[in-house]
Amino acid sequence: MRSEALLLYFTLLHFAGAGFPEDSEPISISHGNYTKQYPVFVGHKPGRNTTQRHRLDIQMIMIMNGTLYIAARDHIYTVDIDTSHTEEIYCSKKLTWKSRQADVDTCRMKGKHKDECHNFIKVLLKKNDDALFVCGTNAFNPSCRNYKMDTLEPFGDEFSGMARCPYDAKHANVALFADGKLYSATVTDFLAIDAVIYRSLGESPTLRTVKHDSKWLKEPYFVQAVDYGDYIYFFFREIAVEYNTMGKVVFPRVAQVCKNDMGGSQRVLEKQWTSFLKARLNCSVPGDSHFYFNILQAVTDVIRINGRDVVLATFSTPYNSIPGSAVCAYDMLDIASVFTGRFKEQKSPDSTWTPVPDERVPKPRPGCCAGSSSLERYATSNEFPDDTLNFIKTHPLMDEAVPSIFNRPWFLRTMVRYRLTKIAVDTAAGPYQNHTVVFLGSEKGIILKFLARIGNSGFLNDSLFLEEMSVYNSEKCSYDGVEDKRIMGMQLDRASSSLYVAFSTCVIKVPLGRCERHGKCKKTCIASRDPYCGWIKEGGACSHLSPNSRLTFEQDIERGNTDGLGDCHNSFVALNGHSSSLLPSTTTSDSTAQEGYESRGGMLDWKHLLDSPDSTDPLGAVSSHNHQDKKGVIRESYLKGHDQLVPVTLLAIAVILAFVMGAVFSGITVYCVCDHRRKDVAVVQRKEKELTHSRRGSMSSVTKLSGLFGDTQSKDPKPEAILTPLMHNGKLATPGNTAKMLIKADQHHLDLTALPTPESTPTLQQKRKPSRGSREWERNQNLINACTKDMPPMGSPVIPTDLPLRASPSHIPSVVVLPITQQGYQHEYVDQPKMSEVAQMALEDQAATLEYKTIKEHLSSKSPNHGVNLVENLDSLPPKVPQREASLGPPGASLSQTGLSKRLEMHHSSSYGVDYKRSYPTNSLTRSHQATTLKRNNTNSSNSSHLSRNQSFGRGDNPPPAPQRVDSIQVHSSQPSGQAVTVSRQPSLNAYNSLTRSGLKRTPSLKPDVPPKPSFAPLSTSMKPNDACT
């Protein structure tokens, strides 16, 4: 069972490591408002004018023998670490080394800027106990000197710094002294083409790497040099020669050279390294496809952790990619093991790099130091065989890469916009000096503080993110308004518990721990898990713990257990990435804060606090001694931590119930909204359907007169009405002899854009006329048509047309025949006294009945059998009505506002031609006079008849407008005579001076079909005597 559990654990660990780890959050955060209290060095001496400043251009800092050395441009400053500093750090000594004017002039002649033609100190080493070795760029002419450590006075001769110091301050270089010899790595020419790892000084011969050989070095950037055992290790990054086909791929490298290397023979590798080997450093996130951090930024010296010698290195992504940084740890034994592995070679310039088989490796093995256990018979490297020397010359690259501990980064930082560039380690942190704390510096002036936790195997397997600090002081470090936040170097001094952080314009002294921020809050002090801080029981405050402290204190570095400790109200330390409180901690604001807290039941009055004249910035500086005198600021309940937590089961149930209730509520809301919309749509559709049916029943017979003849409103105050040709005067006769308006004119807006405009057709007044019903009306018309069938037509001019005369059962007749006497005209066009609509309707009904009886008697007297049969047959036959009508008069005709009278004259001649003629009389006669004229015409001719139906559209005084065109219809008769029947319509052009005897009454249609071409014929007023049906 135990073995299965272990197997499951390692499987889960493997899968957990396969994914990309997330960034850890800091326990504590210190912003710039708090760290600006730290002392700053800007190049001043004590007692001097502090307002004057000059550009420092700090290149590096070092701590030697309790003294901080600051290497800058043209100067070296020393600072006594033991001297306490409050606001500003003053230098104790200052060394000035400026370039000679001749070197400056030469530098300017080579095209360099005057700011570059200075002496930038790039090498500052302790040569021995009494001397310093210093090298500078010296206006692109590197030079080196020796100085006394205590007085900073030069001694000895100045010598060339070529291959020891770079020409340009921007170029990277490393150097160290080992066994009295200087090992340096830099460039040796003005153009920085020849990169070299160089050994000089001392009794050993000068050695260097092979010149202009990309297999040895290809555009390297040197980071660190480490002395370990029999070798000197150089850490750098360069363009990977084994990946030339993929472009400029940069790999981190580690190279080794033997300390006792004396160079090769006179034939091979003379005055060159015979032990130079290099290998790749692997710092990547494991997975199916490894994610590599290839830009090496900084490397520590060899440090000892739990009995193992390791180096810590910071890596980052390329500068043209997304920012990301990682810290990897390497065991020195792993590095040495790689250099004893297989070599890598390229057989041809176009081939890939492959491992070299072991049988091809010569003896003695290349890369070993002379006099070692495997090369005891070779006292010096000059005695190596040529095969060994030739092989090491062409095969300096190892096949395998140096793996990091646990094959994964020790720390990752990928969700930020900066890269980690510097590193400093305290391997004896805490009161018992048993913890390892790492400080990482970034290019944005931010320092990250980590606790290195050691696993059971003795290797680094986890890290604890303790603190994040923003230490750059913009007020004191900016120069000419420019803020350069890149960290140039970090030096840790364990004796003073300080970390010196160097920028290009200043140096800031940062305490290793910020214990005073916790004040008298025990919970935050323990939860910070800072090895430098502890809860002092005697003073009841969180204080810094010095090594071998005899004070009684409490710490919990491994777990940070705070069970039973109450919350604090006077701490703004961020725990687990979140600020626990933002209450101020300065002495001047404590009383004000306490008063506001007590008066409001535990809530601090921030407005009162900020408005107080004695208050300071809530995020301002805090002194460590201010918290010792505070009273009544801490509120601790001493409740068990688990009592304040919510059970996971209850939390899960609450979440599920909240989700279900939200889903139900959402469903009900959606249903209600959809149902409401569905009802609205149904109501709209029902209304549209009813409106469609009403329109369909009225459109074929209803005409909007106001839209047809113009937009001018009638003078009659009565509302406008739609007129129908089937009902007299637009009114519907009801059994009660009451007239009703059919349809209001403003209820329908007909599309009459194709009809004449108001400019050509004046406005007509509308009126309605009662009707006796469509069925009775049709019988009367059929009887009248029957009585005129056998009568000879009256001679009149006929206008021919090609349009046939058709009748359709579904077509509402627009041309009907009515017997109209001359009294009808008088009724329509002569001003009469107003009478009620009921009286008018009764009078018209009597006239219609009289006409019907007269026609019937006439038919019976003329031809009894023929007339009766004809009358009976016509009751069931619809009238023959032309399908196209509604000709309009010319625009220039004189119109009247009294009403519109349309009449068609029908003449029977010997050729049986029927002529429909429309005329508009100007004079109206009485009905009795009309009847007399009709009887007189019947005595002259019994075969001709003129019947007129008068449709009045208004009660105005003026005559109706004349039509604009004439439709002529010619019908070929089927009678034996072979004569044609012609129906014509034409306007009256005689200014309405004569009145026709009888005619056909036409009604306007709603919308005429395609009109024929207008044709005009002279109006003939000569008529033959006709016989009217009596």
Curated annotation (Swiss-Prot):
Glycans are attached at residues 33, 49, 65, 282, 434, 461. The keyword Transmembrane helix applies. Residues 937-952 have a biased composition (Low complexity). The chain crosses the membrane at residues 650-670. It comes from the Eukaryota. Residues 1-18 form the signal peptide. GO terms for molecular function: chemorepellent activity; semaphorin receptor binding. Disulfide bonds join 107-117, 135-144, 258-369, 283-328, 477-506, 515-533, 521-568, 525-542. The keyword Phosphoprotein applies. It is a single-pass type I membrane protein. The modification Phosphoserine is found at residues 698, 952. Keywords: Cell membrane, Developmental protein, Differentiation, Disulfide bond, Glycoprotein, Membrane, Neurogenesis, Phosphoprotein, Signal, Transmembrane, Transmembrane helix. Residues 19-649 are extracellular. GO terms for cellular component: axon; membrane; plasma membrane. It is found in: Cell membrane. Pfam families: PSI (PF01437), Sema (PF01403). One of its GO terms (biological process) is negative regulation of angiogenesis. Belongs to the semaphorin family. Active as a homodimer or oligomer. The SEMA6A homodimer interacts with a PLXNA2 homodimer, giving rise to a heterotetramer. Interacts with EVL. Cell surface receptor for PLXNA2 that plays an important role in cell-cell signaling. Required for normal granule cell migration in the developing cerebellum. Promotes reorganization of the actin cytoskeleton and plays an important role in axon guidance in the developing central nervous system. Can act as repulsive axon guidance cue. Has repulsive action towards migrating granular neurons. May play a role in channeling sympathetic axons into the sympathetic chains and controlling the temporal sequence of sympathetic target innervation. This is Semaphorin-6A. The lineage of its organism: Eukaryota, Metazoa, Chordata, Craniata, Vertebrata. The gene is SEMA6A.
